[in-house]
Amino acid sequence: MEESAASGGYHMLKPADKQDVYPLSSAQKRMYVLNQLDRKTISYNMPSVLLMEGELHISRLRESLNQLVNRHESLRTSFTEADGEPVQRIVEEASIDLHVFDAEEGEAEQKIKEFIRPFDLSGAPLIRAALLRIADQKHLLLLDMHHIIADGVSRGIFVKELALLYKGEQLPEPKLHYKDFAVWQNEAGQKERMKEHEQYWLSVLSGELPELDLPLDYTRPPVQSFEGDTVRFRAGSGTAKAIEKLLAETGTTLHMVLHTVFHVFLSKISGQRDIVIGSVTAGRTNADVQNMPGMFVNTLALRMEAGEKQTFAELLEQAKETNLSALEHQEYPFESLVNQLDLPRDMSRNPLFNVMVTTENPDKEQLELQDLTISPYEAHQGTSKFDLTLGGFADENGIGLQLEYATDLFSRETAEKWSEYVLRLLQAVAENPNQPLSSLSLVNETEKQTFLEAWKGKTLPVPTDKTVHQLFEETVQRHKDRPAVTYNGQSWTYGELNAKANRLARILI
């Protein structure tokens, strides 16, 4: 996730007048609509697991959780409709149960999966907690919230405050709550301020929008299930150092490099150059909301078209400009953009893009309390909001990467192979960023020879109702920018070869 750029956009944020119900923010509205379409989905749950090692006082933990719930209005919020519009209602007081279960170490993953289940948005609080007792001195705290009340930053706020409350510290009362932001966002003045941002996004996404055509293992189902899995892999310290040098020389970020690498990868497996890749921003552009729990994260649609003769370094510079411009206009709600573009509704895919790139700081912070250590515990949710999501982070061991994929569309074997391709591209451009995009290969020489041997002597059936040049023209339409012929070190794409053939044909006619 890219850091939010500083902005003065929230300078008029103030406590809202007390009401029975409050409007939803733009991001909340989209979450509400998605939940109404499928109330059994867990794709917008936000589970987290904390490993607690040492002397744990369960009664104190239970009390601290309920103090946290009553400290933040967002944790006491429910969602319903009034006059045909979704609204949020805040209850004055709420409580959650902390269910305690005994479990073996090997049972933890299954217990975590069983813990994650759909939320009913009409009933507050939209947070659950459970405790797995693995041993006397080892517990797993399971927390789950709905995305409509929180984001990744919120989760970090909750964990730190929970630890402080457990220690018995008195925390200052929040001056502002998320409903204050939602009311502010719905004011007429803010809608007017959004017009400049709106014009930027409508300009970037003007004309015919590209639809990424990925090679699928399975037929796309009519309704997206959001079921997924993840392949985790790493770039070693050598590649990480080379990338650090590249970042310093180009003034770019790891997010920009991964965006560019992912674009090249997607272009090579799809044959398309004009691609929209999603990204996210924390959306907290003012100090007043830095420690406010709620749904601030915004989605950005990064559209980029690679040139036929570009090098990776040139495309990286383009990605830098694309990302910086997008961050300048990040306040415009993605939900409003989707509505303005009037995209056709398709339950089988996401609007605007089906792939995403993210970068986040790894959550490895340990909290040391008296006789108790709290640290993150990695658990996989088993969902994928998009066809593919490339995630990355830098740490002391290099660069950590993960490819999340929709299991309705791709096999594990394909995802693992594509992870190797992404890593190969990253290693290649780290070593030499000035390579032409056309020279970057997903496969190594051994794999090339294996493919050639596998196809040697094989024939494929061809349509008998079309001429050779018609079949070639159709191939050009599908793979215009892919290499078609290589001879004596020179390469021509299908588009270039077709242009040469047409020139020769005009001479002969």
Can you annotate each of these PLM segments?
Residues 413, 470, 484-509:
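Conserved AMP-binding/adenylate-forming core of the ANL superfamily
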Residues 1-6, 64-112, 165, 177, ...:
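Non-catalytic N-terminal regions of enzymes
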Residues 1-36, 63, 176-180, 197-199, ...:
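Regions immediately C-terminal to embedded phosphopantetheine-bearing carrier domains
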Residues 29-39, 47-56, 65-67, 81, ...:
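Adenylate-forming
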Residues 1-9, 48, 164, 249, ...:
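4′-phosphopantetheine-dependent carrier domains
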Residues 151:
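A Lys-centered signature of the CheY-like receiver
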Residues 5, 11-16, 20-22, 59, ...:
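Key residue(s) within conserved catalytic/signature motifs
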